[in-house]
Amino acid sequence: MTKLVILDRDGVINQDSDNYIKTVDEWIPLPGSIDAIARLNRAGYSVVVATNQSGIGRGLFDLDDLEAMHEKLSGLLAQQGAELAGIFYCPHTPDDHCHCRKPAPGLIDAIASEFGVSLNGVPLIGDSLRDLQAGLSHQCTPILVRTGKGTATEKKLSSQPEIELQQAPVFDDLDQAVDYLLAQDKDKDKDKDKDKDKDKDKD
């Protein structure tokens, strides 16, 4: 069974900017984010990125620039023996009215199709409401981080009609969110061991 985690990029893995991340030099990883992805890999998770990149549609940078940023990310991960299972991006602006710009579910649809699995319960970690909303149609488990736009988003959560978002756990950064996920895994493993012990007692 494939274990997936879906991450937003800007504001979760790397620093964000109101002026967009346009060059490889502007792409700067947030403290702990590379190690957090590596820890997910070591725990058996495939990590996928779903990111809006409207700077392409706005003419602020091109696909070569985007590829250079992602090569930098991949290189940093490789140094820790880690990798991404895929990067799914939307290059469109809001005026394009596309199906893939979050909060529309197109990127999440594409991930489900690519991996051929249900995304029900798959953690989706983001810093904005649109990140978390994008996963609702697939019943992803939303997790908010306070980096990037996250602090402002946290203030908005209580007014959201989607009860799933109101109940989303909030962490300071990706590193802490991964701590939470891995701790949950340990708890599940303990429960499985208890069930096995009960079955042995029945025998």
List each language-model region with its residue ranges:
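Non-catalytic pre-domain segments flanking phosphatase-related domains
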Residues: 1-9, 13, 42, 171, ...
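Acidic, Mg2+-coordinating phosphoryl-transfer loop and its flanking beta/alpha structural elements
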Residues: 125-169
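Substrate-recognition element of Asp-dependent hydrolases with the DxDx(T/V) motif
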Residues: 33, 37-70, 83-96, 135
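Asp/Glu-rich intrinsically disordered low-complexity tracts
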Residues: 185-203
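Conserved Lys-Pro-Asp/Glu-containing loop-to-beta segment of HAD-superfamily phosphomonoesterases
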Residues: 102-132
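Active-site neighborhood of HAD-like aspartate-dependent phosphohydrolases
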Residues: 1-48
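Short, electropositive alpha-helical surface patch
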Residues: 59-73, 99-112
